Regions:
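Feature captures the catalytic ectodomains and active-site-proximal regions of enzymes
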Residues: 1-260
């Protein structure tokens, strides 16, 4: 199984620009695709935690990267992630950069993101995307049974540059190119599950159901905010995914005979 997370990806950019995003376009043509609406607060840390635990935000209780002025750690999340339930002796699983906490979570892969994974500098974000692409391809060359990776760069770019449509679109082109490389390791004629998704969409401030971040932050003015409508693309996934946690439930069902 291959699971690719693209933090903050939105159909509002992808669909109008399909002709410039050939790999997103191919996924839309050859896979099932739709909007996944996040009914709970569309913040990255709790949503990715739901995706990778199979639990709702209420069930896992993880609210944000920082709670009561304290940076959260893995030990602060009172829940098991799917890779912790799956037996490593039975399933070769490699997990890269799940942004439930900082630093992001990895499993059976050694990796350190550029700038501790929190940079908003465009050059560093570009370096970070390329580094994660290279590590992902290195891991995929090994042919793991379960591979998951999350790319965070679109979220950072969107927050600070949402008012610059061409710049944001250029970063979607970069992400599309990364997808093309990763999908070289997926056989579209096989019965292997493939999931590509985001944790939330993106929009101007005030367009989403709830405001997740203020417009003014210590890092600068934010030009956009999270939207509850996320991207969901699946192939060979015979499971009714209505909420983020359903992704984790599907993963656990798929490997139910290999749980530890």
């Amino acid at each position: 199984m291959i699971l690719i997370g693209v933090d903050a990806a939105t159909w509002d950019i992808i669909k109008p620009h399909r002709d410039e995003l050939p790999n997103f376009s191919r996924l839309m043509e050859e896979c099932d695709h739709r909007t996944l609406t996040v009914d709970e607060k569309p913040k990255s840390a709790p949503v990715w935690t739901s995706i990778f635990t199979g639990l709702s935000q209420e069930e896992h209780g993880h609210r944000d990267f920082i709670v009561d002025d304290e940076l959260q750690k893995r030990s602060d999340i009172d829940a098991e992630f799917v890779w912790e339930k799956i037996d490593d002796d039975k399933v070769d699983q490699r997990i890269l950069q799940v942004p439930a906490v900082y630093p992001q979570l990895n499993h059976n892969v050694d990796y350190e993101p550029v700038g501790y994974g929190v940079t908003s500098d465009l050059d560093e974000l570009d370096e970070d995307m390329e580094k994660l692409r290279e590590k992902s391809l290195e891991v995929l060359e090994d042919g793991p049974d379960f591979f998951a990776v999350v790319f965070m760069q679109l979220d950072k770019v969107s927050h600070f540059y949402w008012d610059d449509e061409e710049l944001v679109l250029d970063w979607y082109r970069k992400m599309d190119d990364v997808l093309g490389d990763l999908l070289e390791h997926y056989d579209f004629d096989s019965d292997e599950p493939l999931i590509v998704l985001s944790d939330h969409g993106f929009a101007e401030h005030g367009e989403g159901r709830v405001q997740t971040l203020p417009e003014e932050t210590p890092a600068g003015e934010l030009k956009g905010d999270h939207h509850e409508d996320a991207v969901l693309i699946t192939k060979n996934v015979d499971y009714d995914i209505e909420d983020p946690e359903d992704v984790g439930k599907f993963v656990l069902e798929h490997y139910e005979e290999q749980l530890s």
